[in-house]
């Protein structure tokens, strides 16, 4: 009898647990939707609300997802104006103010809330497949690290879907916390690292409708790759992403466009670095010429008031060092990978002229001191 009771209890609990599955986040959803409108003007306040009400990663990401899916409306007027770029803050601010946006705004907001809630998260760019064909538009979604695993989230698709150039609204959680192996059946990221798969699909395999990699494949440790990527500066991240994309098989038109975008991002960074080096070199020159003029005034005043000889010699040495530092910076500019190079010729000329004049004054000073 006791044995039968145990079996009954086991079956009852199993059935009850399965029945309650859809309501697992019911309370989380209610709390997430109870946030006052005064706390939804920015993602920092939304994240603070979430952190004050939930203590697990799964509930935090659910609350963020629920809020986004229920409070950000799809902006159908901008259906064909998806701009894939790197400025997440601008995407977030624009959409939060209007409480509307397109996929990149949904992804940016969810990612921003998750990050500010203490979760590791990425907004991912790519394209999708549905009804047997690849969509011609770009798309964006999210990845969040929850309970030691990466999961994918697409709040845009749970708000509605595109079909034949039109957006049809709906509601649900079909694209909440989906496993990478399932998500790849409909979503292809430009960067294969963000498939979160040990054996990523090529772009061709995705286009042909395969749900997993075929043929002989090389193991890809995406966990280590993501960890290493987080430590890189943006320029190196772009370079690494471009290499991963180029190694992932023949690119589609959309992938080729992404590669061009990455190259443009790199070019902008190269040019920014060059501009900083150039401006710093000019600043060094201005300081050096200013110090040199003060030395000449001191000389013209018959080296009065008197200073230690070593101090006067050190002044000229310091000016030469400023000139040398400026020259080194200009050399780096000339070795730049930027397509649009800065012309350093004029600055190099005045630096060389100044260097010659300083060295002449060093000779004069030595001769002057030897006869004094």
For the regions a language model picked out, list residue spans one by one:
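Bacterial Sec-dependent N-terminal signal peptides
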Residues: 1-22
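Hydrophobic/aromatic-rich core segments of domains that either
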Residues: 66, 106-178
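Active-site rim recognition segments
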Residues: 78-82, 90, 145-223
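Mixed-charge, low-complexity segments
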Residues: 23-27, 49-50, 163, 193-372
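Secondary-structure boundary elements
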Residues: 20-98, 102
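Alpha-helical transition-metal enzyme core signature, strongest for iron centers
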Residues: 68, 103, 107, 323
């Amino acid at each position: 009898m006791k044995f039968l009771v145990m079996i009954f209890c086991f079956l009852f609990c199993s059935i009850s647990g399965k029945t309650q599955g859809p309501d697992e986040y019911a309370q989380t959803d209610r709390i997430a939707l109870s946030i006052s409108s005064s706390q939804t003007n920015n993602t920092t306040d939304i994240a603070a609300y979430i952190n004050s009400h939930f203590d697990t990663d799964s509930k935090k990401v659910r609350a963020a997802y629920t809020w986004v899916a229920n409070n950000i409306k799809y902006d159908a007027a901008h259906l064909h104006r998806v701009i894939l770029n790197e400025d997440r803050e601008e995407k977030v601010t624009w959409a939060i103010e209007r409480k509307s946006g397109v996929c990149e705004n949904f992804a940016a907001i969810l990612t921003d809330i998750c990050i500010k809630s203490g979760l590791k998260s990425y907004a991912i760019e790519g394209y999708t497949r549905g009804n047997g064909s690849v969509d011609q538009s770009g798309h964006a979604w999210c990845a969040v690290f929850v309970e030691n695993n990466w999961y994918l989230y697409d709040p845009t698709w749970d708000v509605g879907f595109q079909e034949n150039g039109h957006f049809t609204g709906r509601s649900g959680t079909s694209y909440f916390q989906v496993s990478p192996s399932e998500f790849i059946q409909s979503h292809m990221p430009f960067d294969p690292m963000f498939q979160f798969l040990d054996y990523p699909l090529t772009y061709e395999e995705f286009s042909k409708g395969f749900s997993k990699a075929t043929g002989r494949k090389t193991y890809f440790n995406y966990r280590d790759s993501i960890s290493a990527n987080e430590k890189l500066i943006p320029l190196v991240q772009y370079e690494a992403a471009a290499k991963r994309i180029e190694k992932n098989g023949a690119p589609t038109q959309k992938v080729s466009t992404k590669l061009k975008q990455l190259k443009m991002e790199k070019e902008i960074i190269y040019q920014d670095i060059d501009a900083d080096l150039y401006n710093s070199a000019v600043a060094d020159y201005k300081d050096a010429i200013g110090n040199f003029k003060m030395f000449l005034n001191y000389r013209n005043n018959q080296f009065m008031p008197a200073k230690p000889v070593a101090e006067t010699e050190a002044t000229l040495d310091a000016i030469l060092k400023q000139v040398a530092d400026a020259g080194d910076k200009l050399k780096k500019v000339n070795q730049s990978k930027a397509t649009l190079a800065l012309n350093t010729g004029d600055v190099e000329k005045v630096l060389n002229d100044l260097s010659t004049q300083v060295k002449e004054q060093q000779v004069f000073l030595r001769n002057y001191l030897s006869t004094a």
